[in-house]
Amino acid sequence: RHPHRLDKLGGTCLHRGCIPTKALLHAAEVADSSRESAHFGVNTTLHGIDMVKVNEYRDGVVGRLYKGLQGLVKSRNVTYVEGAGRLVSPNTVEVNGEQYTGTNVVLATGSYARSLPGLDIDGRIMTSDQALNLNYVPKRVIVLGGGVIGVEFASVWRSFGSQVTIIEALPNLVPNEDIACSKALERAYRKRGINL
C-alpha cells in the first residue's frame, strides 16, 4: 500500500482501478460507435470528446457503486473501520488505537501505481492514477507497459483520437494471459492504429 494514502471502502478497484477504467472504456466504445454508425444507416458526427463530461460520467458510475457498497456493508452488519491497520498478533489488527480480533485475518491492502527510479511524475510523465483523471485528450501517448492497465488506457486514448504507442518489455501484450488471446489483442490493436 502507498504509505500516504488510505482508501475508501471499495479500495483500488472501485476508486482508481477496474471500475473507473471500465467507465472510460464504455465512453470510448460510444465514441467508436458514433464513428461507425453510418454502417448501420445511422447518420451521426462525432464532434470531439468532452473530458469534463466523460469524467463526470466516470465519477457517477463510481459514486453509485460506492453508495451501493456502503449500503450492502451496513445491511450485512459488517463493522467497517477506517484508518491504518497494523497486525499486532496472528489474529488481531489494531486501528486507531482499537484492537479487533478474529479467527481469520485477511490482509487485502490494495495496490498503487509504481514509478521507475529517476522518473519525475510531473504531468508529462504520469501514473495510471493521474491518467485516470486527465481533463484533456492527449495528442500522442506512449504507454509504458502492455499489461491489463496499459492496454486499457491505450484503447481509451485511441478511441478518443490520440496517437498511441505501447512499449512492452516482454514478447507480447498482456503477457500473463494466454498467448492466443495476446496475439489476437495485438492484431486488433494494430488494426486500430495502435503502435506496438
Language model: regions and residue ranges:
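Short beta-strand element of Class I
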Residues: 1, 163-164
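Beta1/beta-strand and adjacent pyrophosphate-binding region of the FAD-binding site
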Residues: 2, 137-149
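Glycine-rich flavin
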Residues: 5-137, 165, 170-174, 178-196
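Mid-domain beta-loop-alpha active-site segment that forms a flexible
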Residues: 69, 148-155
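Structured core elements
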Residues: 143, 152, 165-166
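Gly/Ala-rich phosphate-binding loop of Rossmann-like dinucleotide-binding domains
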Residues: 154, 158-159, 190
